[in-house]
């Protein structure tokens, strides 16, 4: 018989940097989960990633206080900022340009994010990435 799911918890944790301090410790502790068990397992699974890459994680919490977690790909804004070599997006997107990304970079980001997007084709994934780029004040060239 399958375990009874009591809830889900979504966090965004830097790769290889999960520790019991806030925000992870309190979020897991108030649900009665073993904080160190999560931190060790998360850090082990993300050790291949570049340090401080934000990794979204969805934790499934069961009635017996056990849990499983699923790692997602880093946010699209993280990839776009890396591609454009900027620290943050434009404060006035549409008026001020924060930088530029090429169509090749957009395709590469779409291929990385494809498994987390709700689309079937690479073209529709590219349109999603282009929309995110525009909302950050980035120009798409090519």
Curated annotation (Swiss-Prot):
One of its GO terms (cellular component) is cytosolic large ribosomal subunit. The keyword rRNA-binding applies. Keywords: Methylation, Ribonucleoprotein, Ribosomal protein, RNA-binding, rRNA-binding. InterPro entries: Ribosomal_uL11, Ribosomal_uL11_bac-typ, Ribosomal_uL11_C, Ribosomal_uL11_C_sf, Ribosomal_uL11_CS, Ribosomal_uL11_N, Ribosomal_uL11_N_sf. The keyword tRNA-binding does not apply. One of its GO terms (biological process) is translation. It comes from the Bacteria. One or more lysine residues are methylated. One of its GO terms (molecular function) is structural constituent of ribosome. Pfam families: Ribosomal_L11, Ribosomal_L11_N. Part of the ribosomal stalk of the 50S ribosomal subunit. Interacts with L10 and the large rRNA to form the base of the stalk. L10 forms an elongated spine to which L12 dimers bind in a sequential fashion forming a multimeric L10(L12)X complex. Belongs to the universal ribosomal protein uL11 family. Forms part of the ribosomal stalk which helps the ribosome interact with GTP-bound translation factors. NCBIfam families: L11_bact (TIGR01632). This is Large ribosomal subunit protein uL11. It comes from Rhodopseudomonas palustris (strain BisB5). The gene is rplK.
């Amino acid at each position: 018989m399958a375990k009874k799911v009591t809830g889900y918890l979504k966090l965004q944790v830097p790769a290889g940097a999960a520790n019991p301090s806030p925000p992870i410790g309190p979020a897991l502790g108030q649900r009665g989960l073993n904080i160190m068990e999560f931190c060790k397992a998360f850090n082990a699974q993300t050790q291949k990633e570049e340090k401080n890459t934000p990794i979204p994680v969805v934790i499934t919490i069961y009635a017996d206080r056990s849990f499983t977690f699923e790692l997602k790909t880093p946010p699209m804004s993280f990839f776009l900022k890396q591609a454009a070599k900027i620290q943050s997006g434009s404060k006035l997107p549409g008026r001020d340009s924060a930088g530029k990304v090429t169509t090749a970079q957009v395709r590469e980001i779409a291929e990385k994010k494809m498994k987390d997007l709700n689309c079937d084709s690479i073209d529709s994934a590219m349109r999603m990435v282009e929309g995110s780029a525009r909302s950050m004040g980035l120009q798409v060239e090519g």
